[in-house]
Design a protein with these regions (language model features):
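Conserved beta-strand positions in repeat-built beta-propeller and related beta-rich domains
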Residues: 32-38, 76-83, 118-124, 165-169, ...
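Blade/loop signatures of beta-propeller domains
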Residues: 1-7, 34, 38-49, 133
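Hydrophobic, well-structured mid-protein blocks that either form specific transmembrane helices
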Residues: 86-146
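Beta-strand-rich domains and repeat architectures in extracellular enzymes and scaffolds
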Residues: 10-43, 58-70, 224-230
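Blade-loop segments of beta-propeller domains
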Residues: 52-81, 85-88, 94-108
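A short helix->beta-strand "capping" segment at the edge of beta-propeller domains
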Residues: 1-18, 51-55, 199
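Short loop/turn segments that connect beta-strands within beta-propeller blades
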Residues: 47-52, 90-94, 131-135, 177-181, ...
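Beta-rich, blade/repeat-based domains predominating
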Residues: 17-28, 62-72, 102-114, 147-159, ...
């Protein structure tokens, strides 16, 4: 049985509405590592929760569309959309440590510390299990709700044995078991977005919900592409 999870707003943060948010991950109590996409605008930087300011650390050439990212110990991985390359960066100073080829699109990425692997999405209904050292493909897992495949899996966050995933072009976040691909809960963010007037009538450039960063327990940060706010929520 699929649980319909509850979403509770704790607070909002002012956010840079020029950021086409792709990856979002906590670095420490006050700082969030994030990637922003689009050709000509792709970058990686750090968002300061105390000052509510984004600081750019890496700017990419116009030929690169940055996608999801995830931290693995003292380095982090960054996907590209159509370029077929995953970049490995030093976490402290953002030096590039290598570029690793992969097939297909790059969308979302999360590090599973318990099983020492990466989980990746490509916009379809499959998770890709990858080696966190060299990005080698280890396995693929079909994600489904009651045997119905769920496509357009996007940004990912791994928390206590589960993956939380944005579904592209929706306001839904799903919670799933990565090894089986079974969805165990869904979270509808639509009522919260409506209450905050996060819609096209108030913000014409607003794009889709995207970006999940785990803080602690059931607290998360969520945002979207070209969003003016980042939301701190509880996902029960």
């Amino acid at each position: 049985m699929i649980t319909k999870g509850q979403v509770r707003l704790l607070r909002t943060y002012s956010y840079d509405s020029n950021l086409y948010t792709q990856g979002l991950e906590q670095l420490n109590n006050n700082h969030i590592l994030l990637s922003a996409g689009r050709y000509g605008f792709s970058k990686v930087g750090v968002y300061d929760l105390t000052q509510e300011i984004f600081s750019e650390k890496i700017a990419f050439p116009d030929t690169v569309f940055a996608e999801g990212l995830t931290v693995v110990e003292d380095y982090f991985w960054l996907l590209t959309y159509k370029e077929g390359v995953a970049y490995k960066f030093d976490k402290a100073i953002c030096n590039c440590l290598g570029a690793y080829p992969f097939e297909g699109d790059g969308w979302g990425l999360a590090y599973d510390k318990e099983n020492q692997c990466l989980w990746m999405t490509s916009g379809n209904a499959f998770l890709q299990k990858r080696d966190p050292k060299d990005f080698a493909l280890l396995d693929t897992v079909l994600v489904a709700i009651e045997s119905v495949p769920i496509s357009m899996l996007n940004e990912l966050e791994y928390v206590d044995g589960y993956l939380y995933a944005n579904i592209w072009q929706t306001n839904t976040i799903v919670k799933l078991q990565p090894d089986s691909g079974k969805v165990v809960a869904t979270y509808d963010i639509s009522p919260l977005l409506k209450a905050l007037n996060l819609d096209k009538s108030h913000y014409p450039d607003l794009n889709v919900l995207n970006g999940i960063a785990h803080l602690d327990q059931q607290r998360f940060l969520i945002t979207g592409k070209l969003y003016p706010l980042m939301l701190e929520v509880v996902l029960d």
